[in-house]
Amino acid sequence: MTAKTKQSWNKGIWENGKQGSHQQTFLPKIWVNIYSTPTS
């Protein structure tokens, strides 16, 4: 995953999290998993 792709993922996940209250507890967990995964 490139830095640009990662940035898009992060933005999309946060935006989606704002729109759905049931998603706010779920999506940040995915975001953390993606963010803490080392890129090669």
Curated annotation (Swiss-Prot):
GO terms for biological process: regulation of lysine biosynthetic process via aminoadipic acid. GO terms for cellular component: cytosol; peroxisomal matrix. It comes from the Eukaryota. It is found in: Cytoplasm, Cytosol; Peroxisome matrix. Keywords: Cytoplasm, Peroxisome. Residues 1-10 have a biased composition (Polar residues). This is Peroxisomal LYS1 stabilizing protein 1. The lineage of its organism: Eukaryota, Fungi, Dikarya, Ascomycota, Saccharomycotina. The gene is PLS1.
